[in-house]
């Protein structure tokens, strides 16, 4: 499958993250993430955009546009969230963005349990971010662990 035919789109909201309290607060707005190859496609870069799909009440929410560089960016499930499925987009600069998945879980899955569809999205994201050489395997596992240990408490 050539990269240029790959566009990943899924429903997700954005979270506010407070560095001091380490609280992650989902903003109650429907949104969408779209990831597609950047024009520097031969370098393996990807364009990432989150945008609200409805008008937020009482606040401005701008789209978030980022460039994903394989090997420099990770998509990490946040294990400490009990009331939702939260992922962090973590850059090697330690910049991070938090998103909550908005596809309804079918059946009786716990709120924080990834559905088959979520796992598919996760695997696609990992595929996008890993099409680089795996030379610094050690370091990246460390980083993953660090990101997962962020205390995320959902404010309902």
UniProtKB/Swiss-Prot annotation:
One Pfam family matching this protein: Rpn13_ADRM1_Pru
Record flagged with keyword Isomerase: no
Location(s), subcellular: Cytoplasm; Nucleus
Sites bearing Phosphoserine, chain numbering: 133, 135, 140
Predominant subcellular localization, coarse grouping: cytoplasm
InterPro entries named in the record: Rpn13/ADRM1 (IPR006773), Rpn13/ADRM1_Pru (IPR044868), Rpn13/ADRM1_Pru_sf (IPR038633)
Entry annotated with the keyword Hydrolase: no
Annotated Gene Ontology cellular component terms: nucleus; proteasome complex; proteasome regulatory particle, lid subcomplex; proteasome storage granule
Residue span(s) of domain Pru: 2-132
SUBUNIT field: Component of the 19S cap proteasome complex composed of at least RPN1, RPN2, RPN3, RPN4, RPN5, RPN6, RPN7, RPN8, RPN9, RPN10, RPN11, RPN12, RPN13, RPT1, RPT2, RPT3, RPT4, RPT5, and RPT6. The 19S subcomplex associates with the 20S proteasome subcomplex to form the functional 26S proteasome.
PANTHER family xref list: ADHESION REGULATING MOLECULE 1 110 KDA CELL MEMBRANE GLYCOPROTEIN, PROTEASOMAL UBIQUITIN RECEPTOR ADRM1
Summary of the function given for this chain in its UniProt record: Component of the 19S cap proteasome complex which acts as a regulatory subunit of the 26S proteasome, involved in the ATP-dependent degradation of ubiquitinated proteins.
Protein name: 26S proteasome regulatory subunit RPN13
Organism of provenance: Saccharomyces cerevisiae (strain ATCC 204508 / S288c) (Baker's yeast)
């Amino acid at each position: 499958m050539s990269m240029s035919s790959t566009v990943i789109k899924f429903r997700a909201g954005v979270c506010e993250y407070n560095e001091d309290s380490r609280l992650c607060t989902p903003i109650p707005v429907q949104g969408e993430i779209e990831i597609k190859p950047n024009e520097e496609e031969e370098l393996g870069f990807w364009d990432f955009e989150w945008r609200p799909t409805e008008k937020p009440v009482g606040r401005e929410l701008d789209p978030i546009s980022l460039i994903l560089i394989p090997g420099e960016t990770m998509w990490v499930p946040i294990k400490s969230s009990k009331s939702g499925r939260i992922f962090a987009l973590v850059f090697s600069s330690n910049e991070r963005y938090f998103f909550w998945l908005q596809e309804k879980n079918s059946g009786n899955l716990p709120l924080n349990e990834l559905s088959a569809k979520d796992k598919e999205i996760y695997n696609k994201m990992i595929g996008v971010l890993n099409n680089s050489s795996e030379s610094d395997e050690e370091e990246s596992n460390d980083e993953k662990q660090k990101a997962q240990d962020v205390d995320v408490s959902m404010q309902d």
